[in-house]
C-alpha cells in the first residue's frame, strides 16, 4: 500500500479528511494518508498475519494474540502453557553469547561502526571504506580523489577496473 492510499477504509479517490466511511474526520495529526489524494481504484489487501485476503494486518483478528513462545494464536507468551522456549542470548555490544547488551561488562568500551570491533571508533578504523572512491583506509571527508568541498555522486565512482575520469 502506498502513502497515497487511505488506511482507514482501503478505498481510493478521496481525501482522508473527506472519507465517506468516517475515519480521519477532521482530526489533526497522526492520520495515515491525511492530505493525500488517492487514485481511482479499490485496493485489494492480503493480511500478513493470517494470510486472508480482503483485510489488512491492522484489522486482523490474530493481531496481538500470537504467542512468541509457541507461535500459536489465542494467547500471548506470558500465558503460554508450553515450556518456555530456550533462546540464545546474544550481546550486541561484544558479540558474545550468553548475555544481553544491558548486562555486558564491556559496555564502556568504544565500538567501531565499520568493522564492529571494540577498542576504536570508525574515524580511527583501518578497515573503513570511502564512499567517494571506494578505497579502504579512509572516509569520504578525507578522500584525496575529489577537490575539497566537492562530493562525487555515486554514479561517478569508478569500479575497480576503471580509472578516475574527470
Swiss-Prot record:
UniProt keyword Nucleotide-binding present: no
Entry's Gene Ontology BP terms: positive regulation of cytoplasmic translation
Zinc fingers (CCHC-type), renumbered ranges: 4-21, 45-62, 65-82, 89-106, 110-127, 128-145
One GO CC annotation: cytoplasm
Entry keywords, A to Z: Metal-binding, Repeat, Zinc, Zinc-finger
InterPro entries linked to this entry: Znf_CCHC, Znf_CCHC_sf
Entry-linked SMART domains: ZnF_C2HC (SM00343)
Name of this protein: Zinc finger CCHC domain-containing protein 13
